[in-house]
Amino acid sequence: MSMQITIAPRRAFASKELWEMHTLRAKVFRGRLGWEVPVLSGMEIDGYDALEPRYMLMRDGETLRGCWRLLPTEGPYMLKDSFPQLLDGQEPPSDPHIWELSRFALETEGAGGYGFSEMTMESIEAIIRHAHERGLSRYVTVTTTAIERMLRRAGVVTTRIGSPQAVGIETAVALYVEIEPTWEALFARRLAS
């Protein structure tokens, strides 16, 4: 499968594309995962979406298959402002070379390599390439411990910021995603295949 992946500021996307993204997020977060997130008119939208984030949208033809949100850590972001307990008392990152990844949503597809679908692996490669090309050193993200294990198996180099804690119905953990080591690992894996 070859997807069209676009990473751009919110204002670069058409209203229909944003509607599709927020609808997909509602379907995944409230519908499939059972998270307590605000859903308005069938769309999952939060205050961080008003901060001019960048989004990654993944399309297979005309169909939106997945998305990711990217926010700089110099302003408000989820780990710092919604899940500070996951920092274990540490100062939240505030650095132009560290951005937060959040709101990863994907249409379900069968698992492929390392427990992730081919589409997920493509999106990971694209988000790491984006950071590498922009000179970012790390992403910060909040995820589940199950996804953390899958990321590591897939070659994503992560560092825990704090200890795992219960957040809603999940066991969550805050992670740094180390860009250069991950870039090298993914590139080496690509050469080996």
Regions found by a protein language model. Give the residues of each.
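Short, His- and charge-rich active-site/binding loops that engage polyanionic ligands
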Residues: 61-91
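Short acidic (Asp/Glu) patches
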Residues: 39-45, 49-52, 77-89
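C-terminal helix-cap and adjacent tail motif
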Residues: 173, 177-193
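Acyl-donor binding region in acyl/amide transferases
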Residues: 78, 84-172, 181
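Short, charge-rich binding segments
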Residues: 47-50, 57-63, 89-95
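Short amphipathic alpha-helix that is part of the acyltransferase structural core
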Residues: 1-47, 55-57, 64
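Short beta-strand micro-motifs in enzyme catalytic cores
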Residues: 52-56, 97, 171-175
